Amino acid sequence: DAAMMLGVMAGLDIADPATNERPAWSPTTLVRHVQADGLRGKRIGVLRSSAGFHGEVDQLLEEAIDSMRASGAQIVDGIEWQTSQNLFAESYDMFGQAYNVLLYEFKHDLNAYLAGLPNPDLAEMSLADLIQFNRNHADQEMPWFKQEIFELAQAKGPLSDENYIDALVGVQKAAREDGIDKLLIDHELDALIAPTAPPGWSIDLINGDNSLGGSSSLAAISGYPNMTVPMGQVHGMPVGL
């Protein structure tokens, strides 16, 4: 199932120019390579910088590592990744710049999605209209939390803005050439593994989300697909690898 999903994620999307950067895969391209002994001889790097946030999740990670080793994989442990600190300045903040990119792209993509809806009334709407609707119906739409992310995104300009382009180039270099690519090359790896995310957390209407740890950001910022398979459960909540 994960191989089929990865094939779709990495496949061609005519609405997404980024998918033109590589040859298109069909949903069955990767499935053909899923074999019972597929891990034998593969070098798997354990990304420890994306683990160590939750003891019970870490225990499941160790069990998964033992299982892969028993299946013939060569485990390369102790892989660490740190963001580059000198792309544009000594205090370069990759995650801050990545959030800046996210806000630009969220506004652009949401407006494009709305414009493509078949309902003409909805197709005329924009992020600005959604913000105003929420303000007009705050009691129903925002009883607990506000819409700060919407408002931050609305303040951004088009994707032709120099600030967006510079931020995108910087974060992709940090996550690609100086991140995933470098780790794979330096350690001669076939793949990197880490816990996907912590177990689900309780809803907190005062403090909001309480997410701790996870490995999705590096793949998301780089633009590479991130594949998750079940690793186990913690207190009945699923966690992935």
Residue ranges and their predicted role:
Residues 1-60, 82, 136:
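A short helix-breaking turn/cap at a secondary-structure junction
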Residues 3, 13-20, 73-80, 120-128, ...:
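Acidic/polar loop patches that form or flank catalytic/metal-binding clefts of enzymes
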Residues 3, 7, 67, 148-241:
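Glycine-rich, small-residue loops and helix-cap segments
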Residues 27-49, 100-176, 181, 230-238:
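Short helix-loop capping/hinge segments that flank enzyme active sites or metal/cofactor-binding pockets
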Residues 50-53, 81-85, 99, 109, ...:
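Solvent-exposed loop/turn segments at secondary-structure junctions
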Residues 57-75:
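Short helix-loop-beta junction
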Residues 57-60, 87-103, 202-210:
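Short glycine/threonine-rich loop-to-helix capping motif typified by GTGT followed
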Residues 73-94:
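Short connector loops at secondary-structure junctions
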